[in-house]
Amino acid sequence: MTEVLWISWGIRLFKSLTLEPAIVLHTRSYKETSLIVESFTRNYGRVSFVAKGAKRPKSKIGVIKTPSCLFLISCRGKGDLKTLTHCEINTYFDPSSENFNSLVYLNELLIKLLEKEDPHPEIFDHYLKVCNFLKHLGKKDLGTHLRFFELNLLKEIGYGLDLKFEANSNNEIKEQNRYAFDPIIGFQLLKDSSDKKNCYKGKDIINFSKGDLTNPDALLASKQIMREAIDFHLGNKSIKIREY
């Protein structure tokens, strides 16, 4: 249950959230005993709130500090920064130590690419799907899931990639050709690829479009393509976890 305030130009401000599915993207200390939490909720997008007293040993909302979980949260407040009134753990993701940085990476993407209080339930559900694999998948298989999460994320926020057609053309991408990638217009046919560092085989692009990254070359190409696209849309922001 959610109380909502409406203002004249159609922007929705949340007065309260009740038992809303949420993941914690980031926390930072606030005063001596509290936390400011950046969360991603299923139905209301990124929501920031204060968890008052969460650092106290016997705090009822101290569970919000538990990493790698799906929570149910309740909070109130009219402004951008709500106040947490209740939280409980719904699911532990329990990522392996090898895959923990992948979870941090996903959280950074959501913080830096999503607007506040802009709902994206499909992204939320896809995030949970990837998190369910963090405990047992190896690096290669997890990489496949990360690439499709990135692809879906860009699509949902309006920056989808065309993996089927050449840029500014109705010509389909062909296996035997090579292409340069431009994050704005897409894949451009290369007549001579000898002077291009970042050129991609048509075969690898087609496999990516079909959801088939079993070939190591296609998996590597998909990683490079998505990094180029994401870095472009991040602008002057950066993904800190890549530095480690």
Name these PLM-found stretches:
Residues 3-35, 40-244:
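Non-catalytic alpha-helical scaffolds and adjoining flexible linkers that form interface surfaces
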